From Swiss-Prot:
The keyword NAD does not apply. Belongs to the TRAFAC class translation factor GTPase superfamily. Classic translation factor GTPase family. IF-2 subfamily. Residues 66-81, 115-129 have a biased composition (Polar residues). The lineage of its organism: Bacteria, Bacillati, Bacillota, Bacilli, Bacillales. Keywords: Cytoplasm, GTP-binding, Initiation factor, Nucleotide-binding, Protein biosynthesis. PROSITE patterns: G_TR_2, IF2. GTP binds at residues 292-299, 338-342, 392-395. One of its GO terms (cellular component) is cytosol. It comes from Listeria innocua serovar 6a (strain ATCC BAA-680 / CLIP 11262). This is Translation initiation factor IF-2.
Amino acid sequence: MSKVRVYEYAKEHQVSSKKVIEALKDLGIEVANHMSTINENALRQLDNAIDGTNKKAEAPKKETTSNENGNSKGPNKPNMTNSNEKSNKPNKPAGQANKPATANKSHGAKPATNKPANTSNQTQSSGNKQPAGGQKRNNNNNSNRPGGGNPNRPGGNNRPNRGGNFNNKGRNTKKKGKLNHSTVPPTPPKPKELPEKIVFSESLTVAELAKKLYREPSELIKKLFMLGVVATINQSLDKDAIELICDDYGVQVEEEIKVDVTDLDVYFENELNEAVDESKLVERPPVVTIMGHVDHGKTTLLDSLRNTKVTLGEAGGITQHIGAYQLEIHDKKITFLDTPGHAAFTAMRARGAQITDITILVVAADDGVMPQTIEAINHAKAAGMPIIVAVNKIDKPQANPDRVMQELTEYELVPEAWGGDTIFAPISAKFGEGLENLLDMILLVSEVEELKANPDRRAIGSVIEAELDKGRGPVATLLVQDGTLNIGDPIVVGNTFGRVRAMVNDLGRRVKKVGPSTPVEITGLNDVPQAGDRFVVFEDEKTARNIGETRASRALVAQRSATNRVSLDNLFEHMKAGEMKEVNVIIKADVQGSVEALAASLRKIDVEGVNVKIIHTAVGAINESDITLAAASNAIIIGFNVRPTTQAREAAENESVDIRLHRVIYKAIDEIEAAMKGMLDPEFQEKIIGQAQVRQTINVSKVGTIAGCYVTDGKITRDSGVRIIRDGIVVFEGEIATLKRFKDDAKEVAKGYECGITVQNFNDIKEDDVIEAYVMEEIERK
C-alpha cells in the first residue's frame, strides 16, 4: 500500500484535515501539516480511531431520526385528539395543540440537523401564519397577509399535507434543490491504482504522464514543483524528470526507442543484425573496385577485360566518372567498378570502396608506388576489404616488379611468395598478359569470403552515378547489394523518390529485374540523387513518397541551418572568415560525381586571404537561372563537359557573367587558382623618388612652418609620401600638405629647382633637414 497524504485521507473520509491531524497526535504520531504522509501502520490506527468516533456520532442521530419520524405522523390526522401529541410530548402546553406544524418546527426539526430542506420549508410555511400567544412575529414584511409573500401570486394552501408541511406549490423548489445539493457533497471517485510500469518514447507532456499514472495533472505539477521543476500541463518533460516523478510514485519506467523509418541506413543495419534464413541465401557475384594512381592502366585493364575501347571515349585518357560493368568468366559473374585515379576524385574513390568486396590495386611496374596509390591502400584498409595487387606494364623494358613489391611491404602488403598474405598478379593490360590468372585470383578470394545474398527480399543498394538526361530526365546508376529490383518498384534514393520506370544493364539492354551485385541504370525518379546515396525499395508508392518528401525537407532544413548556425566552438572561425575575401563559384557538370570532385578540389585550394565559396552545384546544361544567380551573387560559372544554352549565353553577355567551360579538371582548378591570386590584397614596394634639403624655414600664422627646399635628387611630387630625416634619423613620416614653386602650386619639382613645402601635422622642421619623397608601387604576386 502506497503512502497517503493527510489531506487525501481527510478528503476520502469526508473529515477535515485538522481533525485528522488531531487524531494522529492523540495516537502519538507527529505530523507537520496537511501535506505530510501517513505510513501503513499509522493508517490502520487512524482508521480505527476515525471509525470509533463516527460510531459514537451516529448513535444520537438514530434517536433523533426516530423522534422525527414519530412527530411527523401527528399532523397527518387532523381530526384526532391531542392525546397522541401529549403522549409523545408531555411537556408541551395545551394552548399550542391547534398548531401541529409549529409544534413540529419547534421540537421535531430542531435536532434534525441533517434535513435542512424540510426545516426551510417549515419555517417559511409558519411564517405565513399570524403568530399566536406570546410568540414573536416572524421577521417577514408580508407575514400579516394570509395569502403569501407576493401580492401578484395566489396564496398557497394553508392545510398541512401528510408530511406536515403546507402545500405551497411552486415555492422555493429551486432553493430546496440547491440546498440539498450544497449540503450533501458527492463522494469523490477513488483514484485508480498506479501501474507497475509505464513506457514512453523520447518525452512526455505533464498531461500525458498524468494519464499514464491515472493521476490529475495538478497533482503532478505540485510534485514537480516540490522537486524543483516548474512545469505547465502542456510542457514536455525530459527523461530525468519522468524518472523522478515515477520513482516518487514507485512506478518503473521503460524508454521505448523508436526507429526512424526515414533513415535508410536503418534498413542496412537491420540486414546485418537480423537472423537470415540460410536456405534463402544464394551465392552472389563479387563487386570489384579497380584503384590506383593516375595513368597506371586501370581503365586499360578493364578495357582489356571487356574487349571494348572505353579509354578512347575519355577526355585525355582520364576516367571522368564512375563506370560499372559486369563480366562472366567460367560461368561466374564479376562486377567491376572503375573509379578515377587522380587526386581530384578522392571522394569518389572512397565512396566506391564502401560498396565493394575486393580491391584490385593497379601499380605500374615502371613507376612504382605513387601518392594516389597510398590513398587507395588506405581506403581499402579502412573498408576492411581484401587487396589484390596487379603489377601492370610488365611488358616495358624499364619494368621492375620486385621494386613494386618491396615498396608495398612498407604498407603491410607482403606478397605470398615472401611469406605474406597479399596476392600479387603481374599483368600487361595493353597486351592482355596475365589477365586470366588475375580473374582466377578474384574468384578464389570471393569463394573464401563466402559472398551471399537473399534475392527474395525487396532490393537495397547504393547509387554509383547519377545524371540529368535531356530526354529521359533523372537517370541513376544503381548497384543492388541485396534483394531483387523489379520494374515498377516504389523506391527511395537518397532524398529523392519515384517508381522504377525502366532498367538498362551495362550492355545497354532493357531488363525487367536484376539481382544482387548487379549494376543497372534506372529512370523514374523525381530528382537527381547524389552519387553514393543509398536506395531502398518499399512496399507501396505512398510510403515511398512520404519518406522521400520527409528526407528532402529535412535535408533542406539542415542545409539552411548549417549555413546560419553559429556556436561558441566555431565563433572564432566565423570571425576569421569575415576578414577573408570570397570567390563565389557555380559548378555545372554532366554527372554528379564530377560535380562533387570539382567542388572538393576547389575547396582544397589554399591561397592566403581568399576563400572559395561554392554557392550552387547541379547536373545539366548552364541555363538562364544559373546566370541570374551568378549575376545576383557576383559569381563565376564553371561548366564541366556541359555547354550553356543560347538564352543563357545571351543573358551572360547582358549581365557580364563570366562562364568558363572545361573538359579536363586540372585546367579548371588552375584557372580558378590564378583568379584567386589576382584577387589577393596587392603587395606594395616602396620606391624612393627624390630628396630635398631644407635651406630656410618660414613660420606663417594659420599656415605653419614653410620649408624652403632645394631638390638634390630625383623629384618631389604633390601626392608622394615624405620622411623628415635629421642627422640620419627619421623624425617624422607623413604626407605633403602643399608644394609650391614661387607662389604657384606645383604637381612636381625636379632636381636642381627650389620649392616651398609644408608637411601635414608637422611644423618642427629645421634647417639642414632632409625631406625624402617616396611612393608605394604595386607588385604582382608570384
